[in-house]
Curated annotation (Swiss-Prot):
Residues 4-76 form the Sm domain. Pfam families: LSM (PF01423). It comes from Thermococcus onnurineus (strain NA1). Belongs to the snRNP Sm proteins family. This is Putative snRNP Sm-like protein. One of its GO terms (biological process) is mRNA splicing, via spliceosome. The keyword Ribonucleoprotein applies. Keywords: Ribonucleoprotein. Disulfide bonds: none annotated. One of its GO terms (molecular function) is RNA binding. CDD domains: archaeal_Sm1. Gene3D superfamilies: 2.30.30.100. GO terms for cellular component: ribonucleoprotein complex; Sm-like protein family complex.
């Protein structure tokens, strides 16, 4: 049976993820919530640009219609 997208995201709960937005912005943080519209809640969120942290946000909500991709992040790997 094929994996469903929300199942993959559900397994990433309470883990670090990289969220790539349509306009090229990237955020990294711990995924603490999501819904069927892919609205994403990150804790310890950081904006990443050229592989470097440019701003720290703490807890943020990212609107789902801006999300291009969500990827698990291995600790220590960028």
């Amino acid at each position: 049976m094929a994996e469903r997208p929300l199942d993959v995201i559900h397994r990433s709960l309470d883990k670090d993820v990289l969220v790539i937005l349509k306009k090229g912005f990237e955020f990294r943080g711990k995924l603490i919530g999501y819904d069927i519209h892919l609205n994403i809640v990150l804790a310890g969120a950081e904006m990443i640009q050229d592989g470097e942290v440019v701003k720290k946000y703490g807890k943020i909500v990212i609107r789902g219609d801006n999300v291009l991709a969500i990827s698990p992040v291995d600790v220590g790997v960028e």
